[in-house]
């Protein structure tokens, strides 16, 4: 009876005072939505875990827009190494210490083997060519792809790629010499580093090189992959966490995601078609795609094969490219590090052997330690790709339900004061003192990066050849090499350094020219 009377009253008010009624509705409906959403958001929190309270609708999104990984590290000093945040309505457990990461991602590796799906990347960017291995939820297809990638990236396979590493790293040194005019002209090395990573990825996957950064394919792939990397960010796309924003037909984010997807599909199709033509003519070179296609026992379909190729493409451009760019900026400002590296290299190779031995498997201990310290100090993927639990797990006496999203703050773990007494210092020698210390740059557990062996081998060869060929000198312009202050876009998935220029001065120009020829 009361409900009927209330409805009658509302109806009468709507008829007698339509403008007032519409105004009241326009105010009441959003308010009711916010109130109901707050109840939903509060009930979604994981019992037992502390964390910063957020704002209605958006949760903690506003607080992490500047630099999420560093903000998470700061919060860990207040709430402990594992706490929860909310991105929109989604509760997320953030892991910020090496010890906690070992328990959650090491001891519960299988339980944390899946990935969450985000609207922008999974539903828009990846709805045609599919996802990379690293961004795929757990499935039987993922297991097949991981097996295929592991076979292509294990130690014997990496050893078989030495020729390609030799060719591309030699071309890298040649470009530094060419575009730097023998040390006379300051250059931004980013394009040279990108060509190195891209050409190696294309060679391994499709059997084709990018011989010069002046090729049209170079510009297209590097631009598109850079934009797509931003769509994988866990903080840069508000519509991933606030569903109502997806209804906006004028969303520039969605339009840009679709554009990048279409452009990527175009060059993937071209690379696949050209390989098919070469295979039909019998002129193809051995590569991952061709090997799988010709392997009658392989159980990968075309979508799964593309997933492996996308993984190699994005992984090289993300990790190796960015790490080398950061490292050169540091070396230009730290001649003491260059001197130590040069002394160690010269115990094995003279300046008359600028390109060293491409088959050298990280035998120069100081250069190997330098690579590891660069990986730790810069942590180019500050937040490892997120995980989702596929079953309930218990941590610190608290039950974490199935379906919970986890962020591994690799930046905080690599800077853990419980592991290092001086985490903020750049010091390669720490890896002689603690050779078995954990490093989180490649992730941890079941979904750890499968390409770490190849990346380490490539980085070592690039470092030793560059440092034995050139003296890296700064210009008059300041280079910000600090991992926080020098980050060009803290909202991006990958921490990319701000642009800079340096001089690559040959140590022995006659020997270098002879070696490059």
From Swiss-Prot:
Entry GO MF terms: 3-hydroxyphenylacetate 6-hydroxylase activity; heme binding; iron ion binding
Taxonomic lineage of the native organism: Eukaryota, Fungi, Dikarya, Ascomycota, Pezizomycotina
Protein name: 3-hydroxyphenylacetate 6-hydroxylase
Induction: Induced by phenylacetate and all its monohydroxy- and dihydroxy-derivatives. Induced by phenylalanine and tyrosine.
Superkingdom per UniProt: Eukaryota
Catalytic activity: 3-hydroxyphenylacetate + NADH + O2 + H(+) = homogentisate + NAD(+) + H2O; 3-hydroxyphenylacetate + NADPH + O2 + H(+) = homogentisate + NADP(+) + H2O; 3,4-dihydroxyphenylacetate + NADH + O2 + H(+) = 2,4,5-trihydroxyphenylacetate + NAD(+) + H2O; 3,4-dihydroxyphenylacetate + NADPH + O2 + H(+) = 2,4,5-trihydroxyphenylacetate + NADP(+) + H2O
Pathway: Aromatic compound metabolism; phenylacetate degradation
InterPro entries, per database record: Cyt_P450 (IPR001128), Cyt_P450_E_grp-I (IPR002401), Cyt_P450_sf (IPR036396), Cytochrome_P450_fung (IPR050364)
Family under the similarity heading: Belongs to the cytochrome P450 family.
Keyword Iron tagged: yes
Gene: phacB
Organism in which the protein naturally occurs: Emericella nidulans (Aspergillus nidulans)
EC category: oxidoreductase
Amino acids binding heme: 449
Any one GO BP annotation for this protein: phenylacetate catabolic process
Cited function: Catalyzes the hydroxylation of 3-hydroxyphenylacetate and 3,4-dihydroxyphenylacetate to 2,5-dihydroxyphenylacetate (homogentisate) and 2,4,5-trihydroxyphenylacetate, respectively. Both of these compounds are used as substrate by homogentisate dioxygenase in the homogentisate pathway. The homogentisate pathway is used to catabolize phenylacetate and use it as a carbon source. Can also catalyze the hydroxylation of phenylacetate to 2-hydroxyphenylacetate at low efficiency to compensate for loss of phacA.
UniProt-listed Enzyme Commission number(s): 1.14.13.63
């Amino acid at each position: 009876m009361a409900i009927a009377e209330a409805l009658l009253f509302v109806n009468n008010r709507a008829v007698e005072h339509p403008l007032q009624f519409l105004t009241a509705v326009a105010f009441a409906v959003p308010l009711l939505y916010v109130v109901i959403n707050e109840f939903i958001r509060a009930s979604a929190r994981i019992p037992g875990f502390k964390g910063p309270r957020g704002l209605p609708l958006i949760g903690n999104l506003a607080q992490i827009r500047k630099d999420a990984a560093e903000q998470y590290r700061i919060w860990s000093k207040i709430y402990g190494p594992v706490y929860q945040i909310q991105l929109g309505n989604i509760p997320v457990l953030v892991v910020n210490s090496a010890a906690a990461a070992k328990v959650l991602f090491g001891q519960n590796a299988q339980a944390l083997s899946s990935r969450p799906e985000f609207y922008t990347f999974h539903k828009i960017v990846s709805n045609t060519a599919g996802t990379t291995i690293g961004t795929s939820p757990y499935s039987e297809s993922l297991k097949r792809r991981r097996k295929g990638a592991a076979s292509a990236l294990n130690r014997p396979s990496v050893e078989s790629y030495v020729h390609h590493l030799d060719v591309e790293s030699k071309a890298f040194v040649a470009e530094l010499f060419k575009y730097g005019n023998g040390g006379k002209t300051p250059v931004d090395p980013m394009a040279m580093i990108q060509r190195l990573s891209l050409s190696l990825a294309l060679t391994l996957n499709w059997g084709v090189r990018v011989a010069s950064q002046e090729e049209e394919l170079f510009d297209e792939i590097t631009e598109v992959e850079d934009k797509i990397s931003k769509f994988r960010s866990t903080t840069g796309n508000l519509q991933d966490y606030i569903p109502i924003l997806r209804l906006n037909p004028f969303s520039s984010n969605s339009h840009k995601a679709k554009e990048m997807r279409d452009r990527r599909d175009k060059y993937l199709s071209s690379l696949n078609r050209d390989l098919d033509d070469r295979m039909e003519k019998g002129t193809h070179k051995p590569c991952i795609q061709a090997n799988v296609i010709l392997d009658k026992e392989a159980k990968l379909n075309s979508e799964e094969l593309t997933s492996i190729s996308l993984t190699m493409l994005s992984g090289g451009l993300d990790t190796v490219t960015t790490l080398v760019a950061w490292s050169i900026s540091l070396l230009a400002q730290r001649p003491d590090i260059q001197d130590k590296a040069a002394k160690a290299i010269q115990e094995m190779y003279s300046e008359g052997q600028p390109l060293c031995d491409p088959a050298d498997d990280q035998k120069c201990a100081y250069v190997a330690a330098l690579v590891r310290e660069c990986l730790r100090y810069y942590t180019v993927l500050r937040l490892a790709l997120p995980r989702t639990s596929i079953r309930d797990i218990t941590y610190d006496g608290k039950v974490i339900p199935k379906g919970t999203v986890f962020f591994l703050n690799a930046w905080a773990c690599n800077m853990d004061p419980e592991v290092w007494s001086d985490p903020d210092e750049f010091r390669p020698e720490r890896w002689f003192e603690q050779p078995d210390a954990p490093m989180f740059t490649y992730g941890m557990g079941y979904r750890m990066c499968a390409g770490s062996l190849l990346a380490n081998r490539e980085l070592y060869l690039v470092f030793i050849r560059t440092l034995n060929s050139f003296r890296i000198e700064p210009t008059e312009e300041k280079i910000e090499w600090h991992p926080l202050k020098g980050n060009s876009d803290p909202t991006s998935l990958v921490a990319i350094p701000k642009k800079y220029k340096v001089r690559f001065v040959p140590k022995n120009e006659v020997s270098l020219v002879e070696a490059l020829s």
